Structures are given as C-alpha cells and as structure tokens.
Amino acid sequence: MRLGSAALDSAIALTVWLQIELAEPWQPWLFDIRSRLGNIMRADAIDEPLAAQSIVGLNEDELHRLSHQPLRYLDHDHLVPEASHGRDAALLNLLRTKVRETETLAAQVFITRSFEVLRPDILQALNRLSSTVYVMMILSVAKHPLTVAQIQQRLGEKP
C-alpha cells in the first residue's frame, strides 16, 4: 500500500509558498520541513524505511515535548488560532492543517482493519511535522520568541 503523492505534493507546494511568503527567521524551519516531506514521499514511493531527520537541529522527541508542553519550554501556553495572532500564524496554521490532513490520509492507508500499522515511520514523521509547525505558530505569537539555541538549552535542563 502507498500513500501516493497527491497529499504530500500539496503539502510540499504549500511549504514552498510559505518559503516565499514568510520572513528569514522561518526559512531554516521551512527548508527542513520541505526536505522531510520530500523524504517521506520518496520512502513511500520506493517502499523504503524513512530515516530519522531533525528539524533545525531538533529531533522528533524534542519536537513532541515542545508541542505538548509549550508553556514549560516556549513561555507560551497552547493556542487556538485566531485573527489577532497575525499573518505568520495564520499562514503557518494552513501548513499545519495540510500536514494533519496528510497524516489522517496516511492513517487510513497504513492502518489495516485489524489495526496493524504498516508504515509507523511515515505516520510518526507526519505527526512530528504537524507538531513542528504548531511550535512555529507558538513562536510566531510569543512576545519574546526564543531562538533554536535557547530552546535546545531548555530541552536539556532537568525539570
């Protein structure tokens, strides 16, 4: 079974558009997201395992922690998008929802009726990409957004 390229192609297209629309601070994030989406497409197309890949130096576990505990790590609580969050957050939310749609489609394709997960690597990668874009949204609305180096330092601190 294959996910096919339509959903991934659409997510890549939106990522490329945001690379044009958004300012420099987001470029490394978007470059890595675009790369990850392309690697997912390739792994799906040729049925090979998907290798681990960081986004701006953050691994999948770190991205998961950031998205689930933003107040602890990013100094901003969870958010529900609204117009007052501004243009960057709105554009990033379009990408987040596109990645989530792709993840949902992947779940339909790669989880059998007996609940066997055929491509856990692709499902987890898509889930972490939506987490990544959610983290970007939070950083875009924070009064004093943290740098990646500051985020990495906080992730390394003991609770």
Residue ranges of predicted features:
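Phosphate/pyrophosphate-binding loop motifs in nucleotide- or prenyl diphosphate-using proteins
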Residues: 1-159
